[in-house]
């Protein structure tokens, strides 16, 4: 979260709400009934953590409201009734969800104006393009979204329920097989950190496995909070390999390369060349070293042999959805696009389908 026109978000925190497991254990602590974001994270030992966004789609509105409240009042320290708000949504977000978001913004937070934009479209804007295909992979879900002249093509959007959280799970499982125990929500965060710091994508998986067997070149060590040191080798690339081979964790889905290809093939034959030449990676789960080269190699193998293929992995892609939003909301041409409170009062939540597409 942050302000339009800024080049980076002011606040970045996990979408988590934590509630005390046992009430009133801590005497004189003035215990809150709920903690949000980093505070929930740091007190996770005594809390039960909930994720109100599942697979990119809001599933628990009470907790989501807490997160928004926390964003306005504690993180950005603004009064929401004084600022227009740009929200983002997952591709193919159900209609009822868009309406609910709109309703909460106008009725609970009293915003003067708001707009809902599709995440992948914002990432594409942030890369300086209006046509291309975005592979957006975050914590809960991945999507491939073909976009032509600024508009997402809904019939060709594909969703893959495989993303950062699954890779963390996979690494937890691999480490458990090796005799380490990571089970609680607190320990999962340690494994996530390990994944972010050490994992990478192999250009050739089989060959990398051979290398890992015969040498210690891929081994790296990681210090746990209690001082114990773990050494991980092949695990470093076995975990993100799941993005290309979901069958490794028993999923029947196509990998991210094949899903991207399938998405392009659902588009009109005349625009495919523009899509192949503008494949943009976005989201935290595309931050692994080596992912762009591997993606390029895999798509080249699937595409027609004469096709020029370009995979773009902007360094700021972890936040490119936010950056695209900052750009969009600052444009003078965008100012007529906002849904105003007056329009909402007149038409109700369904106005969002007429004004945001």
Swiss-Prot record:
Keyword Transmembrane helix: no
Any GO CC annotation of this UniProt entry: cytoplasm
Chief place where the protein resides: cytoplasm
Reactions catalysed: ATP + H2O = ADP + phosphate + H(+)
UniProtKB keywords: ATP-binding, Cytoplasm, Cytoskeleton, Hydrolase, Nucleotide-binding
Organism superkingdom: Eukaryota
Family matches, as Pfam families: Actin
CDD domains from the UniProt entry: ASKHA_NBD_actin (cd10224)
PROSITE patterns named among the record's database cross-references: ACTINS_1 (PS00406), ACTINS_2 (PS00432), ACTINS_ACT_LIKE (PS01132)
InterPro entries referenced in this protein's UniProt entry, alphabetically: Actin (IPR004000), Actin/actin-like_CS (IPR020902), Actin_CS (IPR004001), ATPase_NBD (IPR043129)
Subcellular location: Cytoplasm, Cytoskeleton
Gene3D superfamilies in the record: 3.30.420.40, Actin, Chain A, domain 4
Gene Ontology MF annotations: ATP binding; hydrolase activity
EC number(s) reported in the record: 3.6.4.-
Top-rank EC class of the record's enzyme: hydrolase
Family from the record: Belongs to the actin family.
Biological function: Actins are highly conserved proteins that are involved in various types of cell motility and are ubiquitously expressed in all eukaryotic cells. Essential component of cell cytoskeleton; plays an important role in cytoplasmic streaming, cell shape determination, cell division, organelle movement and extension growth.
Misc. remarks from the entry: There are at least 13 actin genes in potato.
Protein name: Actin-100
Highest classification ranks of the organism: Eukaryota, Viridiplantae, Streptophyta, Embryophyta, Tracheophyta
């Amino acid at each position: 979260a942050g302000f339009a026109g800024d080049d980076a978000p002011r606040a970045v925190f996990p979408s988590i709400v934590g509630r005390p497991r046992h009430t009133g254990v801590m005497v004189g602590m003035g215990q809150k009934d709920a903690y949000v974001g980093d505070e929930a994270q740091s007190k996770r030992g005594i809390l039960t953590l909930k994720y109100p966004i599942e697979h990119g789609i809001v599933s628990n509105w009470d907790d989501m409201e807490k997160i928004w409240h926390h964003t306005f009042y504690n993180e950005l320290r603004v009064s929401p009734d004084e600022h227009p708000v740009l929200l983002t949504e997952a591709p193919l977000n159900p209609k009822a969800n868009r309406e609910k978001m709109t309703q909460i913004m106008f009725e609970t937070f009293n915003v003067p104006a708001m707009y809902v934009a599709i995440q992948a479209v914002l990432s594409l804007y942030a890369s300086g393009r209006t046509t291309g295909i975005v592979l957006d992979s975050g914590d809960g879900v991945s999507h491939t979204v073909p976009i032509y002249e600024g508009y997402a093509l809904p019939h060709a959007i594909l969703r893959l329920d495989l993303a950062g959280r699954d890779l963390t799970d996979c690494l937890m499982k691999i480490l458990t097989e090796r005799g380490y125990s990571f089970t609680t929500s607190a320990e999962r965060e340690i494994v996530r950190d390990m994944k972010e710091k050490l994992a990478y994508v192999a250009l050739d998986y089989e060959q990398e496995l051979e290398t890992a067997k015969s040498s210690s070149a891929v081994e790296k060590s990681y210090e746990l909070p209690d001082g114990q040191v773990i050494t991980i080798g092949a695990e470093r690339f076995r975990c993100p390999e799941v993005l290309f081979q979901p069958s490794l964790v028993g999923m029947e889905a196509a990998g991210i390369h094949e899903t991207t290809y399938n998405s392009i093939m659902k588009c009109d034959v005349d625009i495919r060349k523009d899509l192949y030449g503008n494949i943009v990676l976005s989201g935290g789960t595309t931050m692994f070293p080596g992912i762009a080269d591997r993606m390029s190699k895999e798509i080249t193998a699937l595409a027609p042999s004469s096709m020029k293929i370009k995979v773009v992995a902007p360094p700021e892609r972890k936040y490119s959805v936010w950056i695209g939003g900052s750009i969009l909301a600052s444009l003078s041409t965008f100012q007529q696009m906002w849904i105003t409170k007056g329009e909402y009062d007149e038409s109700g939540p369904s106005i969002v389908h007429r004004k945001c597409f």
